[in-house]
Amino acid sequence: QNCCNGGCSSKWCKGHARCC
């Protein structure tokens, strides 16, 4: 799972802010 799937509140978003 990643930012794109978990949303901006996801811990994965930290390194993939562009997914938001």
From Swiss-Prot:
Modified positions (Cysteine amide) in chain numbering: 20
Effect of residue 1 to E: Decrease of affinity to Nav1.2/SCN2A and important decrease to Nav1.4/SCN4A with shift of selectivity in favor of Nav1.2/SCN2A
A Gene Ontology molecular function term of the record: toxin activity
Disulfide bonds: 3-13, 4-19, 8-20
Modified residues (Pyrrolidone carboxylic acid): 1
Tissues where the protein occurs: Expressed by the venom duct.
Localization, UniProt: Secreted
Gene Ontology CC, one term: extracellular region
Entry annotated with the keyword Cell inner membrane: no
Alphabetized UniProt keyword annotations: Amidation, Disulfide bond, Ion channel impairing toxin, Neurotoxin, Pyrrolidone carboxylic acid, Secreted, Toxin, Voltage-gated sodium channel impairing toxin
Main function: Mu-conotoxins block voltage-gated sodium channels (VGSC). Potently displaces (125)I-TIIIA from native rat brain Nav1.2/SCN2A (IC(50) is 5 nM) and muscle Nav1.4/SCN4A (IC(50) is 3 nM) VGSCs. Potently and irreversibly inhibits current through Xenopus oocyte-expressed Nav1.2/SCN2A and Nav1.4/SCN4A.
Protein family: Belongs to the conotoxin M superfamily.
Domain comment (free text): The cysteine framework is III (CC-C-C-CC).
The protein's name in its UniProt record: Mu-conotoxin SIIIB
Natural source organism: Conus striatus
